[in-house]
């Protein structure tokens, strides 16, 4: 960053993937010199705008949003549709919004099933979210990417944040694969920083790091080092595609995929591992 004139920089805008603390702090401290705000913003095409955002007049909290965009009746609810604080739940809207999608072309039933079928009069956006005790909001990833391991439900971002806190890891993606005992077993794919070489010692370091933070039931079954992670053209990691490729399933619609070679690499790793995994094959 020292090679560039950043004197005109006033703030950072961020949207898309959930933040991990390590890159958030790097941007805030190294590029922003601890004085420029990071404006976190999250919404969707289907509502024609944002649901959550930040302001420049309220405290900055790593990876967080200060709250809903004005006019958005956002909330976080549990499996029964009840508001929750301090725990992960579904991001919903309690009132209509002027830009909200009114239907799918020639498929009204799928529209209702996608957004309105979980609870009466609640729009389900499809993201896991959390409101902490101080009132700050967090997006934790797509709810259809949720990991359910040994009776615990967690978002992949919780695992990925730990992986990328290791100085060797550039990016990470966590998925769950079928396990007859735990329901799902944790598998993590890591893209290393330039110049870092893969080694058995590094794999064990990462596995131990995640286990120490999350507990033994969430110890990764396997950790794979890949050249790159499948992502969309706007840089979102495609965990659904990663899981399907690894298990040898049809990945579905790939029209948004930016780097097909990444999917082929993961599919080859899955074949080499003899997916789908069983308890007897476990290496954890």
Regions found by a protein language model. Give the residues of each.
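A general structural signal for stabilizing positions within well-ordered secondary structure
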Residues: 3, 65-66, 82, 163, ...
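Conserved AMP-binding/adenylate-forming
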Residues: 10-136, 143-146, 159
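Residues at the N-termini of beta-strands
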Residues: 11, 90, 170-171, 222
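Generic structural signal for residues in well-ordered beta-strands
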Residues: 38, 74, 172-174, 220-225
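AMP-binding/adenylate-forming catalytic core of the ANL superfamily
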Residues: 95-97, 102-103, 113, 121, ...
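Cysteine/selenocysteine-centered motifs that mediate thiol-based redox chemistry or coordinate metal-sulfur cofactors
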Residues: 263-284
């Amino acid at each position: 960053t020292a090679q560039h004139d950043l004197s005109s920089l006033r703030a950072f805008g961020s949207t898309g993937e959930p933040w991990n603390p390590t890159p958030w702090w790097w941007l805030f401290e190294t590029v922003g010199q601890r004085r420029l705000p990071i404006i976190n913003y999250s919404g969707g095409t289907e509502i024609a705008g944002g649901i959550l955002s930040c302001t420049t007049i309220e405290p900055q909290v790593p990876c967080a949003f200060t709250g809903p965009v004005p006019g958005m009746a956002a909330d976080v609810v549990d499996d029964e549709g009840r508001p929750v604080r301090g725990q992960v739940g579904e991001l919903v809207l309690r009132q209509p919004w002027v830009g909200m999608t009114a239907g799918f072309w020639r498929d009204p039933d799928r529209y209702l099933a996608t957004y309105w079928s979980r609870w009466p009069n609640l729009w389900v956006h499809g993201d896991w979210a959390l409101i902490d005790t101080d009132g700050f909001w967090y997006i934790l990833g797509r709810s259809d990417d949720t990991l359910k391991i040994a009776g615990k439900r967690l978002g992949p971002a919780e695992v990925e944040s730990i992986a990328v806190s290791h100085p060797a890891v550039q990016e990470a993606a966590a998925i769950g694969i079928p396990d007859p005992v735990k329901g799902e077993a944790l598998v993590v794919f890591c893209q290393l920083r330039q110049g870092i070489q893969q080694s058995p010692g590094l794999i064990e370091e990462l596995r131990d790091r995640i286990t120490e933070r999350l507990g033994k039931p969430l110890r990764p079954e396997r950790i794979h080092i890949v050249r790159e992670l499948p992502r969309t053209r706007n840089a979102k990691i495609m965990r659904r595609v990663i899981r399907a490729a690894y298990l040898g399933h049809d990945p579905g619609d790939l029209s948004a995929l930016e780097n097909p070679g990444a999917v082929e690499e993961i599919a080859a790793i899955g074949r080499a591992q003899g997916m789908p995994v069983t308890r007897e094959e476990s290496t954890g």
